[in-house]
Protein backbone atom coordinates (compact mmCIF):
# COMPACT_ATOMS: atom_id res chain seq x y z
CA UNK A 1 0.00 0.00 0.00
CA UNK A 2 1.52 3.20 -1.08
CA UNK A 3 1.29 6.56 0.63
CA UNK A 4 -1.69 7.62 -1.51
CA UNK A 5 -3.78 4.64 -0.39
CA UNK A 6 -2.92 5.26 3.22
CA UNK A 7 -3.91 8.91 2.88
CA UNK A 8 -7.28 8.02 1.31
CA UNK A 9 -8.08 5.52 4.06
CA UNK A 10 -7.24 8.07 6.72
CA UNK A 11 -9.50 10.64 5.04
CA UNK A 12 -12.35 8.09 4.86
CA UNK A 13 -11.95 7.30 8.56
CA UNK A 14 -11.94 11.00 9.38
CA UNK A 15 -15.13 11.57 7.33
CA UNK A 16 -16.81 8.61 9.03
CA UNK A 17 -15.84 9.79 12.50
CA UNK A 18 -16.97 13.33 11.66
CA UNK A 19 -20.31 12.12 10.25
CA UNK A 20 -20.90 9.91 13.27
CA UNK A 21 -20.06 12.81 15.59
CA UNK A 22 -22.42 15.12 13.73
CA UNK A 23 -25.24 12.57 13.89
CA UNK A 24 -24.64 12.03 17.60
CA UNK A 25 -24.57 15.79 18.19
CA UNK A 26 -27.80 16.15 16.22
CA UNK A 27 -29.45 13.41 18.30
CA UNK A 28 -28.31 15.12 21.51
CA UNK A 29 -29.62 18.47 20.25
CA UNK A 30 -33.01 16.99 19.29
CA UNK A 31 -33.27 15.14 22.61
CA UNK A 32 -32.33 18.25 24.57
CA UNK A 33 -34.90 20.32 22.68
CA UNK A 34 -37.59 17.73 23.37
CA UNK A 35 -36.74 17.66 27.07
CA UNK A 36 -36.72 21.46 27.11
CA UNK A 37 -40.13 21.60 25.44
CA UNK A 38 -41.54 19.02 27.87
CA UNK A 39 -40.14 20.90 30.87
CA UNK A 40 -41.37 24.21 29.47
CA UNK A 41 -44.84 22.72 28.97
CA UNK A 42 -44.81 21.37 32.52
CA UNK A 43 -43.80 24.79 33.86
CA UNK A 44 -46.54 26.47 31.82
CA UNK A 45 -49.15 23.98 33.05
CA UNK A 46 -47.95 24.38 36.63
CA UNK A 47 -48.22 28.16 36.33
CA UNK A 48 -51.69 27.86 34.78
CA UNK A 49 -52.74 25.58 37.64
CA UNK A 50 -51.38 28.06 40.18
CA UNK A 51 -53.25 30.91 38.49
CA UNK A 52 -56.49 28.87 38.47
CA UNK A 53 -56.04 27.98 42.15
CA UNK A 54 -55.36 31.63 43.04
CA UNK A 55 -58.44 32.71 41.09
CA UNK A 56 -60.61 30.04 42.74
CA UNK A 57 -59.28 31.05 46.16
CA UNK A 58 -60.01 34.73 45.52
CA UNK A 59 -63.43 33.83 44.13
CA UNK A 60 -64.24 31.83 47.27
CA UNK A 61 -62.99 34.69 49.46
CA UNK A 62 -65.20 37.09 47.49
CA UNK A 63 -68.19 34.77 47.97
CA UNK A 64 -67.47 34.57 51.70
CA UNK A 65 -67.24 38.37 51.93
CA UNK A 66 -70.52 38.70 50.03
CA UNK A 67 -72.20 36.26 52.40
CA UNK A 68 -70.77 38.07 55.44
CA UNK A 69 -71.88 41.46 54.07
CA UNK A 70 -75.34 40.10 53.31
CA UNK A 71 -75.58 38.54 56.77
CA UNK A 72 -74.50 41.81 58.41
CA UNK A 73 -77.01 43.81 56.36
CA UNK A 74 -79.74 41.29 57.15
CA UNK A 75 -78.89 41.41 60.85
CA UNK A 76 -78.80 45.22 60.82
CA UNK A 77 -82.21 45.28 59.14
CA UNK A 78 -83.56 42.81 61.67
CA UNK A 79 -82.24 44.94 64.54
CA UNK A 80 -83.91 48.01 63.04
CA UNK A 81 -87.20 46.13 62.73
CA UNK A 82 -86.96 44.88 66.33
CA UNK A 83 -86.07 48.37 67.54
CA UNK A 84 -89.05 49.83 65.71
CA UNK A 85 -91.28 47.13 67.22
CA UNK A 86 -89.89 47.84 70.70
CA UNK A 87 -90.53 51.56 70.21
CA UNK A 88 -94.16 50.86 69.31
CA UNK A 89 -94.63 48.48 72.24
CA UNK A 90 -92.97 50.88 74.69
CA UNK A 91 -95.13 53.73 73.39
CA UNK A 92 -98.19 51.59 74.14
CA UNK A 93 -96.93 50.93 77.65
CA UNK A 94 -96.23 54.64 78.20
CA UNK A 95 -99.77 55.44 77.08
CA UNK A 96 -101.16 52.76 79.40
CA UNK A 97 -99.14 54.28 82.26
CA UNK A 98 -100.68 57.68 81.49
CA UNK A 99 -104.14 56.12 81.48
CA UNK A 100 -103.49 54.78 85.00
CA UNK A 101 -103.78 58.33 86.27
CA UNK A 102 -107.45 58.31 85.30
CA UNK A 103 -108.09 55.36 87.64
CA UNK A 104 -107.65 57.40 90.81
CA UNK A 105 -109.76 60.26 89.46
CA UNK A 106 -112.94 58.21 89.82
CA UNK A 107 -113.03 58.30 93.61
CA UNK A 108 -115.80 55.74 94.07
CA UNK A 109 -114.26 53.13 91.75
CA UNK A 110 -110.74 53.83 93.04
CA UNK A 111 -111.89 53.44 96.64
CA UNK A 112 -113.26 49.97 95.83
CA UNK A 113 -110.07 49.13 93.96
CA UNK A 114 -107.92 50.09 96.95
CA UNK A 115 -109.93 47.73 99.14
CA UNK A 116 -109.48 44.88 96.65
CA UNK A 117 -105.74 45.55 96.39
CA UNK A 118 -105.40 45.47 100.19
CA UNK A 119 -107.31 42.17 100.40
CA UNK A 120 -105.09 40.66 97.71
CA UNK A 121 -101.95 41.63 99.63
CA UNK A 122 -103.32 40.26 102.90
CA UNK A 123 -104.16 36.94 101.22
CA UNK A 124 -100.67 36.76 99.80
CA UNK A 125 -98.86 37.69 103.00
CA UNK A 126 -101.05 35.72 105.42
CA UNK A 127 -99.48 37.61 108.32
CA UNK A 128 -101.28 38.52 111.58
CA UNK A 129 -99.66 41.96 111.62
CA UNK A 130 -98.61 44.02 108.62
CA UNK A 131 -97.47 47.51 107.63
CA UNK A 132 -99.31 49.37 104.84
CA UNK A 133 -97.98 52.21 102.74
CA UNK A 134 -99.89 54.32 100.25
CA UNK A 135 -99.65 57.70 98.58
CA UNK A 136 -100.23 60.61 100.93
CA UNK A 137 -103.20 61.74 98.83
CA UNK A 138 -104.77 58.25 99.17
CA UNK A 139 -104.46 58.11 102.96
CA UNK A 140 -108.09 59.08 103.62
CA UNK A 141 -109.47 56.52 101.13
CA UNK A 142 -107.25 53.76 102.52
CA UNK A 143 -108.33 54.44 106.09
CA UNK A 144 -111.98 54.50 104.96
CA UNK A 145 -111.83 50.99 103.43
CA UNK A 146 -109.28 49.35 105.73
CA UNK A 147 -111.73 47.78 108.18
CA UNK A 148 -113.85 46.34 105.37
CA UNK A 149 -110.71 44.97 103.72
CA UNK A 150 -109.57 43.30 106.95
CA UNK A 151 -112.97 41.70 107.49
CA UNK A 152 -113.15 40.48 103.89
CA UNK A 153 -109.70 38.95 104.21
CA UNK A 154 -110.58 37.29 107.52
CA UNK A 155 -113.69 35.77 105.95
CA UNK A 156 -111.82 34.43 102.92
CA UNK A 157 -108.80 33.15 104.86
CA UNK A 158 -110.95 31.96 107.81
CA UNK A 159 -108.66 33.70 110.34
CA UNK A 160 -108.95 36.60 112.74
CA UNK A 161 -108.76 40.05 111.22
CA UNK A 162 -105.08 41.08 111.06
CA UNK A 163 -103.52 44.14 112.59
CA UNK A 164 -102.75 46.61 109.82
CA UNK A 165 -100.62 49.63 110.69
CA UNK A 166 -100.82 52.42 108.13
CA UNK A 167 -97.50 54.23 107.74
CA UNK A 168 -98.23 57.94 108.09
CA UNK A 169 -94.59 59.02 107.99
CA UNK A 170 -93.30 57.39 104.83
CA UNK A 171 -95.59 57.48 101.82
CA UNK A 172 -95.39 56.08 98.31
CA UNK A 173 -94.24 58.60 95.67
CA UNK A 174 -96.83 61.02 94.26
CA UNK A 175 -98.30 60.77 90.72
CA UNK A 176 -95.90 61.51 87.82
CA UNK A 177 -95.40 65.16 86.98
CA UNK A 178 -95.91 66.42 83.45
CA UNK A 179 -92.45 68.02 83.43
CA UNK A 180 -90.79 64.83 84.75
CA UNK A 181 -92.84 61.81 83.59
CA UNK A 182 -89.97 59.38 84.19
CA UNK A 183 -89.10 60.53 87.69
CA UNK A 184 -89.91 58.51 90.81
CA UNK A 185 -93.70 58.27 90.95
CA UNK A 186 -96.68 56.10 91.83
CA UNK A 187 -100.01 56.10 90.00
CA UNK A 188 -101.87 54.57 92.94
CA UNK A 189 -102.33 51.35 94.88
CA UNK A 190 -100.69 50.04 98.05
CA UNK A 191 -97.64 48.21 99.34
CA UNK A 192 -97.99 45.86 102.32
CA UNK A 193 -95.15 44.18 104.21
CA UNK A 194 -94.69 41.92 107.19
CA UNK A 195 -93.67 43.81 110.31
CA UNK A 196 -90.07 42.54 110.02
CA UNK A 197 -89.97 43.72 106.39
CA UNK A 198 -88.90 40.32 105.05
CA UNK A 199 -92.06 39.76 103.02
CA UNK A 200 -93.32 42.55 100.76
CA UNK A 201 -96.37 42.65 98.50
CA UNK A 202 -96.20 45.51 96.01
CA UNK A 203 -99.70 46.05 94.68
CA UNK A 204 -99.38 49.48 93.10
CA UNK A 205 -101.03 50.21 89.77
CA UNK A 206 -97.60 50.66 88.21
CA UNK A 207 -96.38 47.28 89.46
CA UNK A 208 -99.52 45.56 88.22
CA UNK A 209 -99.11 47.20 84.81
CA UNK A 210 -95.52 45.94 84.63
CA UNK A 211 -96.58 42.40 85.51
CA UNK A 212 -99.55 42.40 83.13
CA UNK A 213 -97.48 43.89 80.32
CA UNK A 214 -94.69 41.36 80.82
CA UNK A 215 -97.13 38.44 80.84
CA UNK A 216 -99.06 39.69 77.81
CA UNK A 217 -96.03 40.84 75.80
CA UNK A 218 -95.99 37.80 73.44
CA UNK A 219 -99.71 38.25 72.77
CA UNK A 220 -99.25 41.99 72.20
CA UNK A 221 -96.38 41.40 69.77
CA UNK A 222 -98.31 38.73 67.89
CA UNK A 223 -101.36 40.97 67.67
CA UNK A 224 -99.32 43.94 66.41
CA UNK A 225 -96.72 42.27 64.23
CA UNK A 226 -98.16 38.85 63.43
CA UNK A 227 -95.36 36.96 65.13
CA UNK A 228 -93.85 36.41 68.56
CA UNK A 229 -90.29 37.74 68.80
CA UNK A 230 -87.88 37.70 71.71
UniProtKB/Swiss-Prot annotation:
Membrane-topology descriptor: Peripheral membrane protein
Residue positions where N-acetylmethionine is found in the record: 1
Keyword tags: Acetylation, Coiled coil, Hydrogen ion transport, Ion transport, Membrane, Phosphoprotein, Transport, Vacuole
Annotated localization: Vacuole membrane
Phosphoserine sites (modified residues): 178
Phenotype of the disrupted gene, per the record: Mutant embryos are lethal, displaying variably enlarged cells with multiple nuclei, large vacuoles containing inclusions, abnormal organization of Golgi stacks, and cell wall defects.
Complex formation: V-ATPase is a heteromultimeric enzyme composed of a peripheral catalytic V1 complex (components A to H) attached to an integral membrane V0 proton pore complex (components: a, c, c'', d and e).
Family as reported in the entry's similarity comment: Belongs to the V-ATPase E subunit family.
Role, per record: Subunit of the peripheral V1 complex of vacuolar ATPase essential for assembly or catalytic function. V-ATPase is responsible for acidifying a variety of intracellular compartments in eukaryotic cells. Required for Golgi organization and vacuole function in embryogenesis.
Protein name: V-type proton ATPase subunit E1
Amino acid sequence: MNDGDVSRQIQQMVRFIRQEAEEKANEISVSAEEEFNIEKLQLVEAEKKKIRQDYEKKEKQADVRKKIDYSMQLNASRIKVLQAQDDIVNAMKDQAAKDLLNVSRDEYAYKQLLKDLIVQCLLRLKEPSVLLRCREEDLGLVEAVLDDAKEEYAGKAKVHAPEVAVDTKIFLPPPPKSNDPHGLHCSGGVVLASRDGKIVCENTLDARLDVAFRMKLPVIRKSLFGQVTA
